[in-house]
Amino acid sequence: TGPEATGKRRRRRTLQDVLAAQVEEIKTRYRAIQPLLKRVMQDSPNESQSRLLLDRILQDVLGYSLSEIKTEQKIQGRAADYVLAPGGVDALVIEAKRIGAPLRDKQIFQATSYAAYAGIRWALLTNVVNWQLYRVATEDKVEADLVFALDLQGGLDGDSAYRLMLLSKTGITRCELLDKLWRKKVALSQESLIAAILNEEVLNKIRAVLLRERGYPLTNQEIQDAIEREVLR
């Protein structure tokens, strides 16, 4: 095989290529169902009609089969509107509200309670148009932390399409993608950044820079006090 034959070989697809293709597929599928979503919203649908539309999105946009969409699940007195089980593995609990109904964090309690008992790490609160994904933690007590929120009403840009892809059958089976997004959110949280800034190693660096640039020797405690007083107030 010469250089010409080698050049003709298809470049091996990277994970980024695969994910980009899946995001484009999500955009295409969503565009197909968007007119129906707009039409239904104008009719002030009830909860039953809202569920039917959510079913369509789960199947036609997110790629779940009927057998992977389990409804009205119960376990030890805890209930879930939906449990998504790609490949038969329970992966996401959904609390579904009527289209356009206001969403509040406390509404996710039932889904997170079910998820915690069933060993599921992700719970979704949605009114079909707005989607809020939570990570369920059970270390000391059951807690639900918001990972991201989506508004589908105006269509999908690249970022929202990627996040919707993470909730699709292909996305949620790659559980490391949601984990990665969650770790990034935690790393960039105010609590994490403050802890990093006030770390002894960072304070040492700041002390050295201030000595070099300003010519005044300071202690780490003096620097920490000033940061807390002047920067983090």
PLM regions and their residue ranges:
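Acidic beta-strand-to-loop metal/phosphate-binding motif
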Residues: 124-126
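A short, conserved, highly charged catalytic patch centered on acidic carboxylates
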Residues: 1-122, 133-233
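Short beta-alpha junction loops
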Residues: 128-130
